[in-house]
Amino acid sequence: GVYPPGTSVELSNGWRGTVAAITPGNLLQPKIAIKEDGKTKIVDLSTEKLFIKRSLDEQPREEVDFLKDAE
């Protein structure tokens, strides 16, 4: 999926971070800010062999209601 900046995510290697930036034309491989040892490291998914495993944020209420109605 597409994750807007500010979304908390878990990467395929277990790291957790926040979507920092999206590159137009490459929405599925954003830059992720990872906090490690008190420092922030930027991981560019377009150059790393990682992917977003899941969002750590709850789905917006409207999205949950829409999905329930579709069942």
Language model: regions and residue ranges:
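Terminal helices and disordered tails flanking the catalytic cores of nucleotide-processing hydrolases
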Residues: G1-E71
